[in-house]
Amino acid sequence: MEKKKSMFVEQSFPEHEIGDTNKNFDEDGRDKRTGTWMTGSAHIITAVIGSGVLSLAWAIAQLGWVAGPAVLMAFSFITYFTSTMLADCYRSPDPVTGKRNYTYMEVVRSYLGGRKVQLCGLAQYGNLIGITIGYTITASISMVAVKRSNCFHKNGHNVKCATSNTPFMIIFAIIQIILSQIPNFHNLSWLSILAAVMSFCYASIGVGLSIAKAAGGGEHVRTTLTGVTVGIDVSGAEKIWRTFQAIGDIAFAYAYSTVLIEIQDTLKAGPPSENKAMKRASLVGVSTTTFFYMLCGCVGYAAFGNDAPGNFLTGFGFYEPFWLIDFANVCIAVHLIGAYQVFCQPIFQFVESQSAKRWPDNKFITGEYKIHVPCCGDFSINFLRLVWRTSYVVVTAVVAMIFPFFNDFLGLIGAASFWPLTVYFPIEMHIAQKKIPKFSFTWTWLKILSWTCFIVSLVAAAGSVQGLIQSLKDFKPFQAP
């Protein structure tokens, strides 16, 4: 039998020496990178404007008109400031001509080394796993919201319309199993652009509905400078815990430092240099998301007041027009399908690259096979990729089914990852790269910023843990709420 008639054809790819540059390969021997600051911005917007935007009205309600926007702006500034430091560390020791570092861990190894590399890996991959679980929860909530919205429209708003999240988590997992066979970040640009468009759609719909609700008057909506009122809305202890949790939710809403290096590794070599292109992408991405966050958070709070739901599109702050709310929730689900891939690709590539280094001659791990699909063309299949990525998606879906707590889960992820990944490591690497003298003015204020963010992360984590404990008391897994 001729080899070309076989469904599977093993591929053999030539090795390319570092420095072998031509139109198909970069100086490190890898396929030529084609990303620009615009595709980088799309990746960032996909990563940042995620499920976090939906809880911002609730977060502003806990903090009030003064502290709410102030905390949003503070996290925005800190995230952009430290992302510029991280962008300069993609190459080492020189940010323009140095050796490429392909992952966050490699960057930390180049500049800091030692035990900090393991701590970075624990924080980064733990955070990425948590985010993919959180996105599974959120996507299923949005899918359920479509079904419940139609039920309310048909039967009235007083009907319970209880629907289990579990079947929709299974649907989401099946889609992710298929998309997870996309080999790497370099093939994700189209999905990120689609997801970014979806995020603009549902954020705009949420803002529009909030403006219409606030302008329409109706029932009295109570907002205050300090948020929910002790003795009326909550007890003193609840106010403290909710404030901490709201800070964690806002921190989560700016989570993209975990994938910044992987995004930067998709950008083509200059001019402009990768670090300049990444800084521009970060500026556009963070500015755009902050604008939408301010709109969604503040307009949502104006519409719902201190009774703002934890997720203002699925918590049924709105019932009509039901078709528009359905469309917004479909946009959320589509966006999170793409966002899930942005955050899980670094996990996939870490396991696969480590396996290939340890067992380079194992065909199960390193073999690539071409499969011809009628009407669709040829696809490359790797058995490790197929088994490992499928298993990962299934496990995250099962965990999401057991712990479907939206706000508390987001707050805990944000609190646990914000300080080490967004603040501590970028600042420490910047100090090492620029050789900033200890106890100098710059060194001192960078350390003050780092420790301040550490304290904020601690209190936010405490609030989220308390919220999870409260949610677990009456929860029964795999059942409709």
From Swiss-Prot:
InterPro entries: AA_transpt_TM (IPR013057). Disruption phenotype: Larger seeds and rosette leaves and increased number of cauline leaves at flowering. Decreased concentration of lysine, phenylalanine, leucine and aspartic acid in the sieve element sap, but no significant effect on aphid feeding behavior or reproduction. It comes from the Eukaryota. Residues 1-36, 79-125, 189-190, 264-283, 343-385, 428-447 are cytoplasmic. The chain crosses the membrane at residues 37-57, 58-78, 126-146, 168-188, 191-211, 243-263, 284-304, 322-342, 386-405, 409-427, 448-468. One of its GO terms (cellular component) is plasma membrane. The keyword Transmembrane applies. Induction: Down-regulated by drought and salt stress. It is found in: Cell membrane. Keywords: Amino-acid transport, Cell membrane, Membrane, Symport, Transmembrane, Transmembrane helix, Transport. Amino acid-proton symporter. Stereospecific transporter with a broad specificity for tryptophan, proline, and neutral and acidic amino acids. Has an affinity for aspartate in a physiological range. Involved in the uptake of amino acids diffusing out of the xylem tracheids into the xylem parenchyma. Belongs to the amino acid/polyamine transporter 2 family. Amino acid/auxin permease (AAAP) (TC 2.A.18.2) subfamily. This is Amino acid permease 6. It comes from Arabidopsis thaliana (Mouse-ear cress).
